[in-house]
């Protein structure tokens, strides 16, 4: 339900040496009780701190759709593979931990935004560390989202020729107009670019709801195929028939692992982290949320993360219990191309990732504008040029780079822990003043430990990944 929002009184500039204006301090106290939503209202006679340069018009439900769509992405196709290399119980435990940690990190971000009245990720970096912090944050956001956009276009590049070839009864490898490189350029120009040129993110909520519907159809189909196929695989690990599996196949391949650790953890854990990154999109969605408060936005985040945790868990579990240890990094490759239901699933996934690209493009453009044009008014030529240049660069990357696996692993091991763990924790330590939270208070100790956890996660993941690259295990595993 859309509600008309009133903008609160102007907030004074906070000081970084430990003091806040009365209005800002009151607003901070109202919002700091915890990262789960509560029923406490604003203190009597006080107005909550509001963002002043934009009056949000996006409803609560549409914001949930936008953030859910920002969370849900190409990583969902690799979660069954991640479960195959961690085990059912270990995977679900890791997935739950990452979901809870993501919610906590959003709490840290929203607290910082409420304290200083800033709702742009890169501006929080500037407030915490000056111009250098702004540049570092902008670079991390751009790299992560370029990686996300690349993974979406990789899916289009690999799946769209198969879909069109199936409809036209043609060989995708033999006809020049079915080449993936040509098709991603056409999709980028005809579909993605027009959506990316919208001025406000809220309008994309309608495409977000459609995208989430497509991925829900993907989940339902994976569950259905589990019960239809059982565990039937051919010698090349691709499902060929819809008949019960022979006993020997079940004995050799169809045994679920509850807990396991192997060298592919260097890819599986980053895939899970990559699957929950939505932090660059949180503050833009917060800006456009109608009647924005920290509790209201935290409720949006909790609902979105909870829904995606359920969807991820079900998809990974039923996908893994269909293919077990033979499952590939992109689960759709396991199904036969002639299956009508899977053909519809491929269409749904293609539609979902295509409509997600414009949502991911928004924070990249915001970061570049804050970095390169901080004092410039809105300009349509600049708005269009940034979107066009970004799409050109990502298309070149997708055309030149042959595999999606190392992008998943590298982005999930570098920018993902930076955005989930490290940046929110250091922002909290630097921005929240000492008179609100002393340096050795429990919330700041928690934030410090959270940041250290992110550094350890990054170091361990990169260490395993570089070891795999050095020994050639990545290539031998088909990456």
UniProtKB/Swiss-Prot annotation:
Subcellular location as annotated: Cell membrane
Positions of transmembrane segments: 59-81, 98-118, 136-156, 177-197, 203-223, 265-285, 303-323, 342-362, 384-404, 407-427, 447-467
Glycosylation positions in this chain: 236
InterPro entries: AA_transpt_TM
Keyword hit for Zinc: no
Key word DNA-binding present: no
Extracellular side: 82-97, 157-176, 224-264, 324-341, 405-406, 468-479
Membrane topology classification: Multi-pass membrane protein
pH dependence as annotated: Optimum pH is 8.0.
GO molecular function: active monoatomic ion transmembrane transporter activity; alanine transmembrane transporter activity; amino acid transmembrane transporter activity; glycine transmembrane transporter activity; L-asparagine transmembrane transporter activity; L-glutamine transmembrane transporter activity; L-glutamine, sodium:proton antiporter activity; L-histidine transmembrane transporter activity
Disulfide cross-links: 231-254
Predominant place of localization: membrane
Reactions catalysed: L-serine(out) + Na(+)(out) + H(+)(in) = L-serine(in) + Na(+)(in) + H(+)(out); L-alanine(out) + Na(+)(out) + H(+)(in) = L-alanine(in) + Na(+)(in) + H(+)(out); glycine(out) + Na(+)(out) + H(+)(in) = glycine(in) + Na(+)(in) + H(+)(out); L-glutamine(out) + Na(+)(out) + H(+)(in) = L-glutamine(in) + Na(+)(in) + H(+)(out)
Cytoplasmic compartment residues: 1-58, 119-135, 198-202, 286-302, 363-383, 428-446
BP terms from Gene Ontology: amino acid export across plasma membrane; amino acid import across plasma membrane; asparagine transmembrane transport; glutamine transport; glycine transport; L-alanine transmembrane transport; L-glutamine import across plasma membrane; L-histidine transmembrane transport
Domain of life: Eukaryota
Record site: Involved in pH-sensing to the transport activity regulation: 471
Keywords: Cell membrane, Disulfide bond, Glycoprotein, Membrane, Transmembrane, Transmembrane helix
Notes on activation and inhibition: Not inhibited by lithium. Partial allosteric regulation on ions sodium binding.
Expression tissues: Highly expressed in neocortex, hippocampus, striatum and spinal cord by astrocytes (at protein level). Expressed in brain, lung, stomach, kidney, spleen and testis. Expressed in the cerebral cortex between the second and third postnatal week, where expressed exclusively in glial cells from postnatal day 14 to adulthood (at protein level). Expressed in the cerebellum at post natal day 12 (P12). Expressed in liver. Expressed inside the cell body of the astrocytes.
Family label: Belongs to the amino acid/polyamine transporter 2 family.
Role summary: Symporter that cotransports neutral amino acids and sodium ions, coupled to an H(+) antiporter activity. Releases L-glutamine and glycine from astroglial cells and may participate in the glutamate/GABA-glutamine cycle and the NMDA receptors activation. In addition contributes significantly to L-glutamine uptake in retina, namely in ganglion and Mueller cells and, therefore participates in the retinal glutamate-glutamine cycle. The transport activity is pH sensitive, Li(+) tolerant, bidirectional and associated with large uncoupled fluxes of protons.
Record-given protein name: Sodium-coupled neutral amino acid transporter 5
Naturally occurring in which organism (per UniProt): Rattus norvegicus
Taxonomic lineage: Eukaryota, Metazoa, Chordata, Craniata, Vertebrata
């Amino acid at each position: 339900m859309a509600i008309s929002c009133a903008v609160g009184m102007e907030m004074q500039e906070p000081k970084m040496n430990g003091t806040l204006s009365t209005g800002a301090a009151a607003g901070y106290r109202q919002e700091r009780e915890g990262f789960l939503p509560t029923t406490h209202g604003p203190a009597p006679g006080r107005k909550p701190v509001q963002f002043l340069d934009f009056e949000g018009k996006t409803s609560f439900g549409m914001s949930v759709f936008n953030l859910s769509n920002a969370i849900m992405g190409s990583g969902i196709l690799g979660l069954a593979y991640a479960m195959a290399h961690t085990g059912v119980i270990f995977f679900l435990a890791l997935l739950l931990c990452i979901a809870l940690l993501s919610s906590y990190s959003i709490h840290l971000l929203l607290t910082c935004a409420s304290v200083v009245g800033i709702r742009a990720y890169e501006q929080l970096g500037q407030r915490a560390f000056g111009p250098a912090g702004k540049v570092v944050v902008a670079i991390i956001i751009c790299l992560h989202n370029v990686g996300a956009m690349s993974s979406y276009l990789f899916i289009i590049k690999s799946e769209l020729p198969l879909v069109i070839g199936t409809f036209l009864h043609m060989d995708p490898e033999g006809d020049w107009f079915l080449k993936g490189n040509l098709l991603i350029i056409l999709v980028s120009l005809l579909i993605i670019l027009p959506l990316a040129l919208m001025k406000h993110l809220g309008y994309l909520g309608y495409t977000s709801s459609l995208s989430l519907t497509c991925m829900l159809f993907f989940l339902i189909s994976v569950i259905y195929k589990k019960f239809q196929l059982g565990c039937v695989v051919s010698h090349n690990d691709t499902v060929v028939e819809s008949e019960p599996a022979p006993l020997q196949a079940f004995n050799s391949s169809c045994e679920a692992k509850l807990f396991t650790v192997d060298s592919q953890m260097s890819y599986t854990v980053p895939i899970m982290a990559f699957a929950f990154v939505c932090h660059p999109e949180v503050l833009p969605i917060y800006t456009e949320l109608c009647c924005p408060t920290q509790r209201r936005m935290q409720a949006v985040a909790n609902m979105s993360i909870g829904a995606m945790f359920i969807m991820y868990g079900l998809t990974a579990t039923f996908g893994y219990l269909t293919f077990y240890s033979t499952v590939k990094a992109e689960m759709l490759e396991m199904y036969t191309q002639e299956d009508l239901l899977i053909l519809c699933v491929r269409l749904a996934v293609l539609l979902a990732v295509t409509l997600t690209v414009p949502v991911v493009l928004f924070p990249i453009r915001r970061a570049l504008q804050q970095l390169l044009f901080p004092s410039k008014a809105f300009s349509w030529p600049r708005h269009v040029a940034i979107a066009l240049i970004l799409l050109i660069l990502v298309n070149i990357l997708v055309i030149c780079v042959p595999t999606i696996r190392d992008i998943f692993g590298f982005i999930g091991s570098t920018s993902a822990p930076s955005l989930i763990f490290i940046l929110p924790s250091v922002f909290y330590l630097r921005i929240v003043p000492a008179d609100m939270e002393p340096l050795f208070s429990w919330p700041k100790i928690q934030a410090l430990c959270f940041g250290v956890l992110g550094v350890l996660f990054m170091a361990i993941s990169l260490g395993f990944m570089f070891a795999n690259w050095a020994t050639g295990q990545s290539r031998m595993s088909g990456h």
